[in-house]
């Protein structure tokens, strides 16, 4: 989604350096289009709503930057009893959302007490991504985004507004 719909096989090693300091980049990784660029752009806008004040991870927002993300909360299976016991909380996000440069994933296994991905992973993401953006000299975004409707009530209201605008255009 952050790469305009092209999935690139992940790697941990960007390249190697020999004893003389000569750098050799890793082999080119396979890339495959998995969604259209248009769909990826729409998904990025939706994912920005996740870090909005009404989203599930407002604690991941970084002042001055457009940030997008996805929260996750999953129950963990306990092999000893074959039942669910504990949680995995996660948040994965990227910034700047309008021109993605960095992606960070935070996964917390078996947290105690609070277990929601946005509440636990969001602050960690914010701290790490803020450091990355500042240390890499990424200028603040300077643009804003209209939030995507997050509830059925908001979706219905937006649909009615769009229909009213369309009706006005037809009568003009």
Name the predicted role of every residue range.
Residues 32-39:
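A conserved catalytic-loop motif detector
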Residues 21-29, 122-172:
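Short, gly/Ser/Thr-rich active-site loops of penicillin-recognizing serine hydrolases
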Residues 1-31, 47-137:
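Active-site beta-strand/loop architecture of penicillin-binding DD-peptidases
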